[in-house]
């Protein structure tokens, strides 16, 4: 299984266009040792030719341009994208579908809840019908694994996760299973197994057991502290209120990952305020000490 990190930042990317927090300002003036990052998206393949796109970020055009296999050049119009899986209906995970309209129809897998959001509050399915029929919806059943024809060796198993639906969702304040999912992706040929959850608000014992059965966990790294945005003066909401489990503190993501000594552990969906973006920070050093990696744009994982 080939896993390509197309984008590793949370919504807004890094540096965020309108932000002058310590991280963003420091990156711009050259005082911060950090890498720029686009908004979270990954691609997965069983052969390195046909790819399943997991989330379509607003930065999708630049992300595809930076990864040569996404343009195999087999025809006058071509793409390496064979299917698209949406983990949720958030703007930073779905807006890229608009930029992919020239390639419609696209095969899109998502849950009933995500399809409802993207047919009402943010009606991408309706809008894109005008381009060669738009998006062909393939329903993700929460209790069933599924395969994608172009990558037959990969088995995808959805996992309903505790998180929050976006502000435009009809059930913003009435959470439903399927608002947000994680994925277990298993390569039936190599036996490699990936746990992928860029939006993760809580890890209970059953979920931890599933994570322990994976070779690599690629998980929510949005915030270091739950009140990080408040501390940085750029927001009023906590990580938990937005459906993200912070790394630091009792019950935080680092405590969770500490229970997975055998797995490769990688944080993704990093918010622009997170001090781990600073490669010289004590927080980054703590991750190194704990053998936890920070995803970056262009990172490749083979399982």
UniProtKB/Swiss-Prot annotation:
Pathway named in the protein's UniProt entry: Cofactor biosynthesis; pyrroloquinoline quinone biosynthesis
Alphabetically ordered keywords of this record: PQQ biosynthesis, Transport
Domain of life: Bacteria
CDD domains: PQQB-like_MBL-fold (cd16274)
GO biological process: pyrroloquinoline quinone biosynthetic process
Function summary: May be involved in the transport of PQQ or its precursor to the periplasm.
HAMAP family: PQQ_syn_PqqB
UniProt similarity note: Belongs to the PqqB family.
Name under which the protein is recorded: Coenzyme PQQ synthesis protein B
Originating organism: Pseudomonas fluorescens (strain Pf0-1)
